[in-house]
Swiss-Prot record:
InterPro entries: Antiterminator_BglG (IPR053665), BglG_antiterminators (IPR050661), CAT_RNA-bd_dom (IPR004341), CAT_RNA-bd_dom_sf (IPR036650), PRD (IPR011608), PRD_sf (IPR036634), Transcrpt_antitermin_CS (IPR001550). SMART domains: CAT_RBD. Pfam families: CAT_RBD (PF03123), PRD (PF00874). This is Transcription antiterminator LacT. The keyword Hydrolase does not apply. The gene is lacT. It comes from the Bacteria. PROSITE patterns: PRD_1 (PS00654), PRD_2 (PS51372). Belongs to the transcriptional antiterminator BglG family. GO terms for molecular function: RNA binding. Residues 66-170, 172-284 form the PRD domain. One of its GO terms (biological process) is positive regulation of DNA-templated transcription. Keywords: Activator, Repeat, RNA-binding, Transcription, Transcription regulation.
Length: 292
């Protein structure tokens, strides 16, 4: 039976499982008037999110420093849907970036400052990711009580496209490589007068997190390879020429100075990050950019 390790609120708790590590459980009133060590009857648990390894536990505690538990469990539920219903393989950092995105969007929505962003639309090339994102809107509405516009599907889908891959367990970063890569990228950004600011801070930080996991993927021999659809490359280059230019500079310098074997797919991921950083409007519209 699950035993309480930590109570987050009346409805959410961290539990110890007999021989299966830990999990976050959610259910109406499951932790009400309970204490650490108390047993939670399994019939009261509505959702369970397993923490498979130390990285999963570290991600959870990192998130809880700044993000409400209801947003965190909503994110876990969305990723659970992606993995179980749609068989999507994603890297662990999506727990951080997606939680952060949902929370920031939630705060802006509540404050009346939410604005739709101009991001690429790839629902034809990535139907599963967009299906997850569409379902995510329903989960967010149910759990958090906010109804984002349909255009938010593009933002949510990009998180799954960007985090495509498969973790083999623990994340081990080479600190010297991480510092070199981060410095190189920041120097290119500064040449184009792009620095971290209040308005772009969230997108800037997500890009830096992507770079950390990029290093880890490049150091693995058995990296899970994801090939970007060719039409996406053409679409990005035509629609976002400035983002393409900056992203290509970053890609070329990393490849020349640090990692010659880097996949061409990374150039496209960089474009997506840069486009959000500078909020570049599309140079031309295509039928696939119509609302879903």
């Amino acid at each position: 039976m699950p035993k309480i390790a930590q109570i987050f609120n009346n409805n959410v708790a961290l539990v110890d499982l007999d021989n299966r590590g830990q999990a976050v459980v959610r259910g109406r009133g499951i932790a009400f008037q309970k204490r650490r060590g108390d047993v939670i009857p399994t019939k009261q648990i509505e959702k369970i999110f397993y923490l498979a390894n130390e990285t999963s536990r570290q991600n959870l505690y990192f998130l809880l420093k700044n993000i409400p538990i209801d947003v965190v469990t909503t994110t876990y539920e969305i990723i659970d849907v992606a993995q179980k219903q749609y068989r999507l393989k994603v890297l662990d950092y999506i727990y951080i970036t997606l939680s952060d995105h949902i929370y920031e969007a939630y705060k802006r929505y509540q404050a009346g400052t939410y604005q739709e962003t101009m991001v690429p639309d790839f629902h034809i090339q990535y139907p599963a990711e967009y299906a997850v994102a569409k379902q995510a809107l329903q989960i967010i509405a149910t759990n958090l009580g906010v109804q984002f516009p349909q255009s938010e599907i593009k933002n949510l889908a990009l998180h799954f496209i960007n985090a495509s891959g498969e973790d083999d367990g623990e994340q081990v970063f080479g600190k010297s490589n991480e510092a070199s890569l981060s410095q190189l990228v920041q120097e290119v950004l500064k040449r184009h007068h792009i620095t971290r600011s209040h308005s772009n801070g969230n997108y800037y930080d997500r890009f830096m997190i992507h770079l950390q996991y990029l290093i880890d993927r490049l150091q693995r021999v058995d990296t899970y390879a994801v090939t970007i659809v060719p039409e996406v490359a053409t679409e990005l280059k035509q629609n976002y020429p400035q983002s393409y230019k900056i992203a290509s500079e970053i890609f070329d310098e990393i490849k020349d100075q640090l990692y010659r074997s880097m996949s061409e797919d990374e150039r496209l991921y960089f474009i997506i990050h840069i486009q959000r950083l500078i909020n570049e409007a599309p140079a031309q519209n295509h039928s696939q950019n119509d609302s879903l």
